[in-house]
Amino acid sequence: MKYVVVSGGVISGIGKGVLASSTGMLLKTLGLKVTSIKIDPYMNIDAGTMSPLEHGECFVLDDGGETDLDLGNYERYLGITLSRDHNITTGKIYSHVISRERRGDYLGKTVQIVPHLTNAIQDWIQRVSKIPVDDTGLEPDVCIIELGGTVGDIESAPFVEALRQFQFEVGRENFALIHVSLVPVIHGEQKTKPTQAAIKDLRSLGLIPDMIACRCSEELNRSTIDKIAMFCHVGPEQVVNVHDVNSTYHVPLLLLKQHMIDYLHSRLKLGEVPLTLEDKERGSQLLTNWENMTKNLDDSDDVVKIALVGKYTNLKDSYLSVTKSLEHASMKCRRQLEILWVEASNLEPETQEVDKNKFHDSWNKLSSADGILVPGGFGTRGIEGMILAAKWARESGVPFLGVCLGLQVAAIEFARNVIGRPNSSSTEFLDETLLAPEDQVVIYMPEIDKEHMGGTMRLGLRPTIFQPNSEWSNIRKLYGEVNEVHERHRHRYEINPKIVNDMESRGFIFVGKDETGQRCEIFELKGHPYYVGTQYHPEYTSKVLEPSRPFWGLVAAASGTLGEVIKDINLSEGNENE
């Protein structure tokens, strides 16, 4: 097993996740099987109870793990399926060590950071790195390890020490370190002092960088590269220029041009890893597909505007998987994507009384969009604005996709304005004692624990069965006319089964349900160009080269190409089945 560690210095949020994902993707083009581990040095057990406005989105895995958003980057770039154990947190590793101490596993010894915690980290890495993550079912060849935060922070100290020991445990030819640093441009001059200081700190902790990836707003000058190489004690070929590009999907090709993979191939002796001809051909095809995808991205002239109506729009990372899924779909449709960010509460009449400009600006964005997306969320703030957005899309014939909460608000809007129940709502927003039974469109799932928040939702990969007589459905056609699909869930509330008949009698058809036939998973409005809602989160399984089908449908419908896309899907997947 080969290990490539990606660490960061100077500041956090510097792009370690994209660089780690891009490095892994390039290693896959050699035919290697690649896995990833993310280390998050916070005390939380997982990201499940963290505010999206503080930490960005919570990414959900097949096994129901609620993890850091970077695991989504790994899955999207590498086309792999990770588990909750691929995300190591301080809280998780401390809990593991403490539970072992309570069992008496340490035989009465004084349990310390070194060696007990650091050994636990190393053991965890070695165990998880061997878990198969792709459709081959084989053990990976390379593990990318991203160390979150900034080297030198007190929170990451135990992990840095564990990695220092780990490099000797696995051997130099099996361990490489890429350090990501910032090269700011001040008054037109590229400054290297922050990088020099970061590398000095890194070396003082016992970690020697094999490559220094320099993040900069512009391409590095040759003199800057030479200066960093000289003062950081590396060769110029070990300094990688990672300047700003139009799209992060260009980063792998940017690294490829600078011979990063050639260096890692030599440094880690990757030529000794046994590969079949099929492995090499698959890797070569991956590179070709990626190059074609970026070319389509560059050559696209037509713009598609999607209004994202949410409640966490102040921090775009709150909807990272959603925006990435829209990007994947737009590239597939050969369109330039323009996301119109609409804060849901700004669509509500109360905002007009307080700030008319904000109100009118938000409605102008919504009304000018080619398609409307209402993503998931929790709580009551902005709900009426989301309902108004769903109403606008339904009445105006604008393509609409509602995800999780988005499905629920679309159902509430339909019950209010089509069925004629103006008091319809969800028991999440109003106590069930305040709602008449017929007005409870969305209810709390009976099996969910109301007392404990962490890990108590309906989580992870679950089947959705397309219902009889749903062959007309666009969303079913987008999935290739299959009878069932498997998608990831994260919710506590569901459509009330008691209102389904009334909804369906008016054309609001629940075309997909769970295996019991009771829980509603997908709806589609008959007679509308594209008005779809999913209780699951299709954004969690979207890949760069294989977009999520509901998102693909939204962008295609917004671009006027839905019929062509459905035809192409059925042709290609029909040929594969033959």
Curated annotation (Swiss-Prot):
Present with 5370 molecules/cell in log phase SD medium. This is CTP synthase 2. Pathway: Pyrimidine metabolism; CTP biosynthesis via de novo pathway; CTP from UDP: step 2/2. Homodimer. Oligomerizes to a tetramer in the presence of its substrates UTP and ATP. It is found in: Cytoplasm. Keywords: ATP-binding, Cytoplasm, Glutamine amidotransferase, Ligase, Nucleotide-binding, Pyrimidine biosynthesis. NCBIfam families: PRK05380.1, PyrG. The active site is at C404 (for gatase activity), H537 (for gatase activity), E539 (for gatase activity). It holds the Pfam family GATase. InterPro entries: Class_I_gatase-like, CTP_synthase, CTP_synthase_N, GATASE, GATase1_CTP_Synthase, P-loop_NTPase. Residues 305-564 form the Glutamine amidotransferase type-1 domain. GO terms for cellular component: cytoophidium; cytoplasm; fungal-type vacuole. GO terms for biological process: 'de novo' CTP biosynthetic process; CTP biosynthetic process; pyrimidine nucleobase biosynthetic process. Its cofactor is Mg(2+). It comes from Saccharomyces cerevisiae (strain ATCC 204508 / S288c) (Baker's yeast). Its main location: cytoplasm.
